[in-house]
Amino acid sequence: VLDVILNEYPSLEDERDEEGRTCLSFAASIGFYEGVCNLLDRSTKNVYVCDEDGSFPIHTAAENGHIKIVKEILKRCPHSKHMLNKLGQNVLHIAAKIGKQNLVKSLMRRDDTKHLGVGQDVDGNTPLHLAVLNWRYRSIGTLASDVKILKLRNDNGLTARGIAESMVKPNYIFNE
């Protein structure tokens, strides 16, 4: 159906919805893999077009945990891994912040994306910092396995461990 519509009205590919999203970004947000592939077959230009909120389709897919779509975008547009949203966050920042552990694990295992773990956003936070700030303990374990990431400090001078220590109240009781 998408093919028929876009063949008849090719300009729809570049139209934006009321939230400022392109067709590709919308398809990525809802996990419509076949639609994403169809749109990428036609053109990859919208991979590099941000929404009104400053995020790109790869960020939208990551935020919603659509690993297959993130991988497809990376396969067809390898440089998209370097794209930053308006907060200076890459795709791994987004996955860590939201707690999409399977995506975090996938990105940290790939030789071409594991370096994203040392990326710092506009506040100097790495994906690990964001995972700690948002209590995404599963992602923390994966990200903390890289010693380089553990040593990085954000703009407040805090490591991820420092953030965790500052967030724990003295009367917390931990159970296993």
Feature names for model-found ranges:
Residues L24, I58, L92, L128, ...:
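Conserved hydrophobic residue in the first alpha-helix
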Residues V1-C50, G54-S55:
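Solenoidal tandem-repeat scaffolds enriched in leucines and small polar residues
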Residues E15-R16, V49-C50, M83-L84, G119-Q120, ...:
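Ankyrin-repeat boundary/linker signal
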Residues V4-S11, N38-K45, E72-S80, M108-H115, ...:
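Ankyrin repeat domain, specifically the short helix-to-loop turn at the C-terminus of the second helix
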Residues V1, E34-G35, K68-I69, N102-L103, ...:
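Conserved ankyrin/ankyrin-like repeat signature
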